[in-house]
């Protein structure tokens, strides 16, 4: 385990102390838990922001040659 020194606001420190006492653990253990939990949660998929952003035929991949080279008869 790597040692890390951080600065936190006093109100956060007080809240950590209260929660640590309630759980009968250390503030450091709580911080490790909170950080690990946050890092495990996947963030929003940036591709989701594009869903519904484009107008056009629903599936151009089925007719890519027609779209790129013009319709073939």
From Swiss-Prot:
One of its GO terms (biological process) is regulation of DNA-templated transcription. One of its GO terms (molecular function) is toxin sequestering activity. Keywords: DNA-binding, Toxin-antitoxin system. Pfam families: RHH_1. InterPro entries: CopG (IPR002145). Antitoxin component of a type II toxin-antitoxin (TA) system. Upon expression in E.coli neutralizes the toxic effect of cognate toxin VapC20. This is Antitoxin VapB20. It comes from Mycobacterium tuberculosis (strain ATCC 25618 / H37Rv).
């Amino acid at each position: 385990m790597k040692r890390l020194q951080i600065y936190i606001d006093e109100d956060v420190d007080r809240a950590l102390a209260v929660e640590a006492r309630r759980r009968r653990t250390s503030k450091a253990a709580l911080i490790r838990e909170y950080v690990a939990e946050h890092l495990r949660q996947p963030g929003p998929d940036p591709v989701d922001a594009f869903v519904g952003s484009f107008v056009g035929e629903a599936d151009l991949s089925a007719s890519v040659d027609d779209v790129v080279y013009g319709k073939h008869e």
